[in-house]
Design a protein with these regions (language model features):
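Active-site-adjacent "gating/activation" loops or surface patches in catalytic cores
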Residues: 252-259, 469-502, 669, 673-676
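Feature 926 captures the class I aminoacyl-tRNA synthetase adenylation module centered on the KMSKS loop
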Residues: 202, 418-478, 482, 527-570, ...
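Residue patterns forming the tRNA-binding/recognition surfaces of aminoacyl-tRNA synthetases
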Residues: 3, 8, 17, 21-25, ...
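Non-catalytic terminal extensions that flank enzyme cores
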Residues: 1-54, 77, 371, 604
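Extended active-site and interfacial segments that coordinate phosphate-rich ligands
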Residues: 57-65, 214-250, 273-280, 290-298, ...
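Secondary-structure transition/capping motifs at alpha-helix termini
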Residues: 68-76, 97-110, 130, 134-139, ...
């Protein structure tokens, strides 16, 4: 026996109970079923450091909608959940916690630190998982993964070794983005550019051979200590005489060459640029072209280098342990140990004192910052591991261009291709302890490098057993790039999950990580599995606050989804995040929107209670014979068929917001506001067969409507569904209504809609005239569609407050004291004089007429003004013409009503 619905719906408690039941029954676990087509989504793994924010809530809601929809369509729908180890963020959390205990990484050692990191992950890392469950995510938790679990680690090692053996991973001294705060390199994609106030300092370098001064400008004067050349353009006529000459570096007195290079732009400034190969990416390339030495003047924690730094590197070089391309290190003397900013001030003061600072020019420029800590990035030459991007990028670009993978919206295809074409080799090593340690070992005796999945026992070159593993870890995105297939059992290509569920289908993610993650998954999937990892990338925007601002800690405008869920329920939050949203576009959060969605939930609950309360104990669900269906039944069933087809089409095109909106409108405006009200007449009438037919249609439509709504609002739909007679174990495994061949009665629908339009017009007129519903009167309806209005007599009596209705093709009787109500299909004559205060109504109408004529005059004057018609935008002119026509129509109707009142 279905349980009775409570008087009010209370999501608190109810949602937790329902979710636990889903988990206990294993409804989210997807079996491999060869008779079904698989549909697979892998969750973009949230960081173990994180907690649910509005961006997560939207991202996961979209994925859950698609998963539930496909599950109901009969697919073997798998949504793989998991979390990311988040190297930099997690390490920072653990280091901060240790700092509170007076400890550092170095004090506890690598093993001790990793033990603490795993403890931290196990204590706090699953917090976000429990929060995802609060949202209603129907993930297969039995397949939950972590980017550092055994399977993912095996995949990471496999890929690293393969790429190394193919020559696509290499180690070398290259220019990298260095974060002095996080004390690690980061990739180009992880650098965020911020507009900052700064200066152009114009410096004077004396030419050794001629004694003249060369003027150049820099935003980073502290790096001049590492200059190894200045560059001019070979075609610049101003400096033809200086080809092959040298300048003397101010403060240091070091002679450096003047080189001719296209990097020097004749049109910019003086056309002279300082070249610091160890601290600028462009200068690094100039240095390679001219075989310039590299001199490092900054330590990895952002201080100027000193004697000890120089001695350490010199010793490595003397012992033959340093690579040939290892930069030299300068003892910066009096500036040693200063931070870069401290050194900048001191160097500028000294340059000014010796006459080498010509002028200071203020400017606003884009400065690279770390995406994690927002510290200013220092470009550094450092020995790191890199992935060669060009051979991997080419097939990844072709796959998208050929349509094997499509972006929704399509405009993001360009973002992806531009990023893939413009990227440098990917720096994948990080100077961190938490993460996948690079599977490379170095022989302490001969320096041989061994890359392997397992630690080598001896050096293959000299036989030594003194092998040391590279201390660095891999970029977090290296393991995340393998996520679509490492989560399904790869590199074991015989794994059942891999063979059945891979390639995956739809990736749902934000536009901000197309470069970070989407691109890398695409080239990884193609390179290692030979298949595109997914066929569709569905891009969503970000959730902004009600003023359109990005949510941030600094603004204090962040909204905690869990607090919203606690107050309004997960269904209301989910519906708010989907209604009105469109792929690729940002949306605004507001409490008012969530409240409106909660009100919709209450409306649905109350309507369902009404239906349940009108069912006898022996009620048998199912549609009645067609002969027992009246016009309103055929109309609601036809509307159901239409909304099911439309919602299906919208979901198939990833128009999730439109689908949700149509289902909500059907339930609220069509089913609740109209059909239920219409059924009350039959339910309370004496015709038992008509009442039973109404009950059957009410239940049938409610059942289908709940199924259409389920992907969007899973909790309340499950709770109501379980209270319906004949319900199955769970709504989530029921058949999706849009796949059924539901009948549409076009003629009956058209007739009923004519009737509805007329009823709406009568009710609007009565409301304007302040006529109480209890005051009823007769009416004459003039129409070319008499059948519709003759069949609808009962509806007119109840909803248009008619005592009796006369339907005619042409009304020729007296119109004295009658009010005219017109729709496109009918003209009604209603004797309202007996129901109203004539003088009061005339006063109201005359006031309305004055207002309408004022509007009429305003629009007429605008359109009679040649300047307006000629110079105003065409759209505005058309809108004004439309407003004029509406004002004319309104005034004419008011005059008719005044005339009718005599």
């Amino acid at each position: 026996m279905p349980k009775e619905l409570a008087k009010q719906y209370a999501p608190q408690g109810t949602e937790d109970r329902i979710y636990q039941n889903w988990c206990d029954k294993g409804y989210f676990h997807t079996l491999i079923d060869r008779s079904k087509k698989p549909f697979t989504i892998v969750m973009p793994p949230p960081n173990v450091t994180g907690q649910l924010h509005m961006g997560h809530a939207m991202d996961e809601t979209w994925q859950d909608i698609l998963t539930r929809y496909k599950r109901m369509q009969g697919y073997a729908a798998l949504w793989v959940p998991g979390t990311d180890h988040a190297s930099i963020a997690t390490e920072a959390k653990v280091v901060a916690k240790m700092r509170e205990e007076g400890l550092t990484k170095e004090m506890v050692g690598r093993d001790g630190f990793l033990e603490r990191a795993w403890d931290w992950k196990n204590t706090y890392g699953n917090r976000i998982v429990s929060q995802l469950k609060k949202l209603g995510c129907s993930c297969d938790w039995q397949r939950e993964r972590f980017t550092m679990d055994e399977g993912c680690s095996d995949a990471v090692k496999e890929v690293f070794v393969r790429l190394y053996n193919e020559g696509l991973i290499y180690r070398g001294n290259r220019m990298v983005n260095w974060c002095p705060h996080c004390n690690t390199s980061i990739s180009d994609a992880e650098v965020e550019y911020e507009a900052k106030e700064g200066s152009f300092w114009h410096l004077l370098y004396p030419v050794k051979e001629t004694g003249e001064m060369l003027e150049l400008a820099t935003t980073r004067p502290e790096t001049m200590l590492g200059d190894t050349a200045v560059a001019i353009n070979a075609e610049d006529p101003r400096y033809k005489h200086l080809h092959g000459c040298h300048v003397v570096l101010p403060l240091l007195g070091r002679e450096i060459p003047i080189v001719c290079d296209e990097h020097a732009d004749m049109e910019k400034g003086t056309g002279v640029v300082k070249i610091t190969p160890a601290h600028d990416p462009n200068d690094f390339e100039v240095g390679k072209r001219h075989d310039l030495p590299m001199i490092r003047v900054l330590t990895y924690d952002g201080h100027m280098t000193g004697a000890a730094d120089k001695a350490a590197v010199d010793a490595e070089k003397a012992a033959g342990r340093a690579a040939a391309d290892e930069p030299d290190v300068l003892d910066c003397g009096k500036y040693a140990g200063m931070t870069a900013l401290e050194a900048r001030k001191a160097i500028l003061a000294d340059l000014e004192a010796c006459g080498a600072l010509k002028e200071t020019e203020p400017l606003t420029h884009e400065v690279g910052t770390c995406y994690r800590c927002h510290s200013v990035i220092e470009p550094m030459v450092s020995k790191q591991w890199f992935v060669k991007m060009e051979p991997l990028a080419k097939p990844a670009i072709e796959s998208v261009e050929k349509g094997e993978i499509k972006f929704v919206p399509e405009r993001f295809t360009k973002n992806y291709i531009n990023w893939m074409k413009g990227g440098r080799d990917w720096c994948i090593s990080r100077q961190l302890w938490w993460g996948h340690q690079i599977p490379a070992w170095y022989c302490d005796d001969c320096g041989e490098t061994v890359v392997a999945k397992q630690a080598p026992c001896t050096c293959p070159k000299c036989g030594s057993s003194n092998m040391t593993q590279d201390p660095d870890t891999l970029d977090t995105w290296f393991s995340s790039a393998l996520w679509p297939f490492s989560t399904l059992g790869w590199p074991n290509e015989n794994a059942e999950d891999y063979n059945y569920f891979y390639p995956t289908n739809t990736l749902v993610t934000g536009y901000d990580i197309i470069g970070f993650w989407v691109s890398r998954m695409i080239f990884s999937g193609l390179a290692y599995t030979g298949k595109a990892p997914f066929d569709t990338v569905l891009i969503h925007g970000i959730v902004r606050d009600s003023q359109g601002r990005k949510m941030s800690k600094s603004l204090g405008n962040g909204i905690d989804p869990l607090e919203v869920i606690e107050q309004y329920g997960a269904d209301a939050l989910r519906m708010m995040l989907i209604i009105g949203s469109t792929a690729g576009n940002d949306m605004r959060y507001s409490d008012e929107k969530v409240l409106a969605c909660r009100n919709f939930a209450n409306k649905l609950w109350n309507a369902s209670r009404f239906v349940q309360m009108n069912l006898p104990e022996d009620f048998e669900p199912g549609l009645p014979e067609e002969s027992l269906l009246d016009m309103s039944d055929k109309w609601i069933l036809s509307e159901l068929a239409k909304v099911a087809a439309e919602a299906t089409a919208n979901l198939d095109k990833y128009e999730l917001g439109l689908a949700a909106e149509k289902v909500e409108n059907f339930i609220w405006e069509v089913y609740c506001d109209w059909y239920i009200e219409i059924c009350k007449t039959r339910l309370n009438g004496e015709d038992a067969a008509a009442a039973d037919a109404a009950r059957k249609v009410l239940v049938y439509v409610l059942d289908k409507a709940l199924k259409l709504l389920h992907p969007f609002m899973p909790f309340i739909t499950e709770e109501i569904y379980q209270a319906l007679p004949g319900s199955a174990e769970t709504i989530m495994n029921e058949k999706w209504p849009g796949d059924e061949n539901m009948k549409v009665w076009a003629e009956d629908c058209a007739d009923f809609e004519k009737l509805m339009d007329y009823i709406k017009a009568v009710r609007a007129m009565r409301a304007e005239m302040n006529v109480h519903p209890a005051k009823k009167t007769s009416m004459v309806i003039e129409t070319a569609s008499p059948a519709a209005f003759e069949k609808g007599g009962a509806y007119l009596a109840r909803f248009a407050f008619a005592t009796d209705v006369t339907v005619t093709a042409k009304y020729e009787g007296s119109t004295d004291g009658m009010v005219n109500v017109a729709t496109p299909d009918a003209k009604g004559f209603i004797p309202m004089m007996e129901l109203i205060d004539r003088d009061k109504e005339l006063a109201r109408l005359n006031k309305e007429l004055t207002k309408a004529e004022k509007e009429l005059g305003m629009f007429t004057n605008q359109l009679n003004n040649p300047k307006f018609v000629e110079k105003a935008p065409a759209k505005l002119v058309e809108e004004t013409r439309a407003k004029l026509a509406a004002a004319q129509d309104k005034a004419a109707k008011i005059k008719e009503s005044i005339a009718a009142l005599g």
